[in-house]
Amino acid sequence: MPIIRKIHARQILDSRGNPTVEVDVYTESSFGRAAVPSGASTGVHEAVELRDGDASVYLGKGVLKAVENVNTIVDEGLRGMLVTEQEEIDRMLLELDGTPNKSKLGANALLGVSLACAKAGAEYSGMSLYRYIGGTMANTLPVPMMNVINGGAHADNTVDFQEFMIMPIGFTSYSDALRCGAEIFHALKALLKSRGLSTAVGDEGGFAPNLTSNEEAIELVVEAIGKAGYKAGSPASKGGLGEGQVMIALDPASSEFYDADKKKYVFKKSDKRELSSEEMAAYWEKWSNDYPIISIEDGMAEDDWAGWKMLTDRIGSRVQLVGDDLFVTNSVRLAEGIEKKVGNSILVKVNQIGTLTETLEAIDLAKRNGYTAVISHRSGETEDSTIAQIAVATNAGQIKTGSMSRSDRMAKYNELLRIEEELGAQAVYPAAKAFRV
């Protein structure tokens, strides 16, 4: 029987050199290991990532309390349970914590256990993780959102918006789409070098040059697409998905530059302009009319519901509007957004909610209500590639996992190549069908 015999956690380091939690789960005949990511720009509504707070050790970012919680409370609570009973395991984790935001044991502790149990269950069952979670119909490789220029909280430069990404939609296979992204990445690097701009990279592997404006960043991306020999789509207002091979996705991370006291969006890193919610929505409408943008994540701040409604009403019929800080992978927040008719997509970060079951519930709720789901990494990552498996398991159709550099990002892309190979003729690359706009 696949009974949990031992659960052991340890403190390891993530891609930024900060501590994070890794968990091992043992049964008599299987083993699972999972490492937990962490974010730089975190939503205030996320589940609690438990840190030690001792400034003399890892600048207060140690996770030994979370590790101890796993090695005592969780180990004792889950021993003897069947590792294949994922929903029961996750229910027990929530009971052991007993708080609405997982502040007692830490979402980082619970997530490590939840994912490691899933991996041990998959190994016991003799299946790949995507097949174990998703069943026989799990066959869709995701369209990647590839971060090529970093700004905002992810880079020390003059760009206000956090991520400028490319999405290869004009292809019939994931491997060809990945090649396209890599070639554009290298074309952009050459373009930056030719202009005497920095090719240093940010937390997620994208370039982080000092530019004169946010507009210069997106214009460089469009130029790099052409330099690499590919065709950028038209602006969404002109039927962008109907033509071209590559579209652009943005993550401004607007909560990071929203001044709640002023109720203004303040472009602190570039030209210092201040925009109201209505002006910010109009700004994104203009960009979607001028550039081949198919997706905007967190175009408005996490609690600016009125601003989100304005933005959705303006461009939600033609641009994917992704809620990250807005929804925080939380079914309750998502249900509120659905009721208010704001956004049309959810970003899915497993550590925002803390268990696999809750993650899958959020994805299911989104799909049932016509919202897309984008499976996502965090800026602080590890070599763990579980999100690649989850993307295929849920047939989400989209994944956001960084640029074409840094092995913590490439681990996910390479795992998807292996899954595509394993699926063979069953593999589906959705291309433009990944979107509902």
UniProtKB/Swiss-Prot annotation:
It catalyses: (2R)-2-phosphoglycerate = phosphoenolpyruvate + H2O. It comes from Chlorobium phaeovibrioides (strain DSM 265 / 1930). Keywords: Cytoplasm, Glycolysis, Lyase, Magnesium, Metal-binding, Secreted. (2R)-2-phosphoglycerate binds at Q162, K349, R378, S379, K400. It comes from the Bacteria. It is found in: Cytoplasm; Secreted; Cell surface. One of its GO terms (molecular function) is phosphopyruvate hydratase activity. HAMAP family: Enolase. GO terms for cellular component: cell surface; extracellular region; phosphopyruvate hydratase complex. Its EC number is 4.2.1.11. GO terms for biological process: glycolytic process. Catalyzes the reversible conversion of 2-phosphoglycerate (2-PG) into phosphoenolpyruvate (PEP). It is essential for the degradation of carbohydrates via glycolysis. SUPFAM superfamilies: Enolase C-terminal domain-like (SSF51604), Enolase N-terminal domain-like (SSF54826). It is an enzyme of class 4 (lyase). This is Enolase. Binds a second Mg(2+) ion via substrate during catalysis. SMART domains: Enolase_C, Enolase_N. Mg(2+) binds at D251, E297, D324. Belongs to the enolase family. The keyword Cytoplasm applies. The active site is at E204 (proton donor), K349 (proton acceptor).
